[in-house]
Amino acid sequence: MAKPTRKRRVKKNIESGIAHIHATFNNTIVMITDVHGNAVAWSSAGALGFKGSRKSTPFAAQMASEAAAKSAQEHGLKTVEVTVKGPGSGRESAIRALAAAGLEVTAIRDVTPVPHNGARPPKRRRV
């Protein structure tokens, strides 16, 4: 039987893009897109091998940002706008890691959704 042919990754030449940082209480996901919203690179704390409560640490967010930035730079990315969503602990360290990886951060936007008193929140935890 013939081997199924895999699609080859096409190297995109993009100068500027948008880095979407989704920081939840349990994980941090970093996705880098072009200005139209097409994904260029992504990474998350869980994808890097962090398990359980270690995924929610600032260090895990930093490593996820560095991994996403590295693979985005292979596509020619130089400048990036940052949008941050969520209340997680990895927000600040993820932005710093993007800048430290060699990407020029031009803008930082907080796009955390705030309800106008929508759904009822879950009950308080009793530990």
From Swiss-Prot:
Keywords annotated in UniProt: Ribonucleoprotein, Ribosomal protein, RNA-binding, rRNA-binding
Top-rank taxon, per record: Bacteria
One Pfam family of this chain: Ribosomal_S11
Signal peptide extent: none
Keyword Methyltransferase found: no
Keyword Transferase: no
GO cellular component: ribonucleoprotein complex; ribosome
Single GO BP term: translation
A molecular function (GO) term: rRNA binding
InterPro entries for this protein: Ribosomal_uS11, Ribosomal_uS11_bac-type, Ribosomal_uS11_CS, Ribosomal_uS11_sf
Role played: Located on the platform of the 30S subunit, it bridges several disparate RNA helices of the 16S rRNA. Forms part of the Shine-Dalgarno cleft in the 70S ribosome.
Subunit structure: Part of the 30S ribosomal subunit. Interacts with proteins S7 and S18. Binds to IF-3.
PANTHER family referenced in this protein's UniProt entry, alphabetically: 40S RIBOSOMAL PROTEIN S14/30S RIBOSOMAL PROTEIN S11
Family of the protein in this entry: Belongs to the universal ribosomal protein uS11 family.
Protein name: Small ribosomal subunit protein uS11
